[in-house]
Amino acid sequence: MKQSHKTILLWALLIFLFVMIYNLISDGTSGEETLDTTEFKTLLQARIDERLADAGEGPALSDDRRALAQRAGEIASVTVEPNPNDNATYVLRYEGSGEDGLDPDKKTLVYGEYKGTIENLLTAAGISYEVKAKEESTFWQSLLISWLPMLLLFALFFFFMRQLQAGGGKAMSFGKSKARLLTDHQNKVTFKDVAGVEEAKDEVEEIIAFLKDPKKFTRLGGRIPKGVLMMGPPGTGKTLLARAIAGEAGVPFFSISGSDFVEMFVGVGASRVRDLFEQGKKNAPCIIFIDEIDAVGRHRGAGLGGGHDEREQTLNQLLVEMDGFESNDGVILIAATNRPDVLDPALLRPGRFDRRIIVPRPDLRGRTGILGVHTRKVPLSTEVALEVIARGTPGFSGADLESLVNEAALIAARRDKDRVDMEDFEDAKDKVMMGAERRSMIISDKEKRTTAYHEAGHALVAKLVGAETDPVHKVSIIPRGRALGVTQLLPTEDRLGFTREFALNKIAILMGGRLAEELVLKQKTTGAGDDIDKATDLARRMVTEWGMSDVIGPLNFASGGKQEVFLGRDLPQAEAYSQETAQRIDGEIRRIVTDQYERARRMLEENRDALERVARGLLEYETLDGNDIDTLCQGGRLSRPAVVSKPSADAESSVDEDEREARPALFPPLGKSGTDPEPEPA
């Protein structure tokens, strides 16, 4: 029963109990007074004497006697209990003498002929009455009425005791595992819904085959892996692969996040680990999936958190449960992380995580398969080629491709289309890769011109540096995200590594934007800040990590200060090289960046006309692709119409006063009704 239903039932019981208690207290006792027969007859006789005195047929009454008569006139009801030998019980109710429009002499006799003394006295007192027989109740009715309040009180007491016990259980349930047992009815995912990670699928399918037919593997002395660690960048499908395992395994599947172990109380994490594996043993064979295990499995050590903390205690218990003194046969632990470098070495040793599955970003064939999975429920135009889209999205993860398909469907719906076409996918790709357009942003002509030359410098240098670079895909001066302009380079194939020449060309391209501003506008702006940061970082890694400097040689000088303190490792030590070496490293970084800066300068100076044409093309069309830039560099013209840009900030501020006065007012002046009709547009 849901909590809301319990609350409604509780309130209903309380209301019913209060009504019963009120009826028992008020029934027959509210405003009633018990009189014996003698006293009652005295009151009625005083009432009779008062009536006779008022009619002039009797003596005047004393004050005490008149008070008794007045009291008799206030009688509301009379209950007459006859002799025990009489089987009838009579209830007499009077309506008042002449009140409420009733006849004072009205008499109603419902049960038999009862002409006793009380009736005669009531008649003489002028009280209109009604005689009814009291209904006799059965034994069960009497028992129910007498015991019902007690039963209700007992039920409420029992209910509150249960609530208190449940509350106490919740207070002591911090050590219980929060793992959720997945059922067949919860969004079942199979391996048909997973694409682009064929090797990883083969690895986990073998584990599922072992669970379904263990004798096939144990007959040769093999054993099932105790743990499987899935590693890969964010969005590559590690959790989706785990959900597919849950849908295919046919055994109990417990799912929990690494952050669900540690709470504010000491010892809770270790207790939850013990409870999790106890549940697994009871349901063996089963699978336990821990998502984001780096939250609890980080490297043990000093760091800034001390040598012992709650996370370390939880990790120790996890290590013992996975491969400790007691065996956990039939319990397979599957974990996922995108930070395998921070995991404790004891967690990664054989016997705990025997198998490590790499879930990389998909290649061309994998991206095509992922697009096919995500477009099953999307109506596509006949011109849509998923392989073409996959070729244009190198480096995209599965989550990126799902977002691309969703954005394309939303764009097509916004344009009132019945099917999604290639134009929608192209716009969606630009939105995912470069950010959403901010066309409503008003930019001055000066800022727009600066942005155009900046992006033209990037694009032109990318065209001139040679083949060892990514080709220009699109250049735009439409503000996207936090940038005023974007130059997008898109590789034609998956790039797993690059050469020294590629890195140098990358630095030259980054410097092209600042150089174009200097050559044409004779100024330096803050727009090149991000380019300079990326160029410096790339040059530093060339010198200190990749051994691409002839002066420094193939040595690594980056590991000394590279460790991150808050990952639980030891505090980073001082730099493992001398001040002289540090100066040589800094000088080599400066030389690499400066050389490429001068190289890009020569390219732009020798191709100044091409730079002007590309910049003018950006100002006219706002967005250019690689073919457009080739056409402009060769002196050609684009055949498509120019974009009609919105008024800039300068144009907005230079409106004539006469034109401003001629505009109709949006609101009427104060004190006027403003009922005149708006002027029709010319």
Swiss-Prot record:
GO cellular component labels: plasma membrane
Active-site positions on this chain: 455
Cofactor info, note text: Binds 1 zinc ion per subunit.
Keywords: ATP-binding, Cell inner membrane, Cell membrane, Hydrolase, Membrane, Metal-binding, Metalloprotease, Nucleotide-binding, Protease, Transmembrane, Transmembrane helix, Zinc
The protein's required cofactors: Zn(2+)
Gene3D superfamilies for the chain: 1.10.8.60, P-loop containing nucleotide triphosphate hydrolases, Peptidase M41
UniProt record similarity statement: In the central section; belongs to the AAA ATPase family.
Listed name of the protein: ATP-dependent zinc metalloprotease FtsH
Native source organism of the sequence: Haliangium ochraceum (strain DSM 14365 / JCM 11303 / SMP-2)
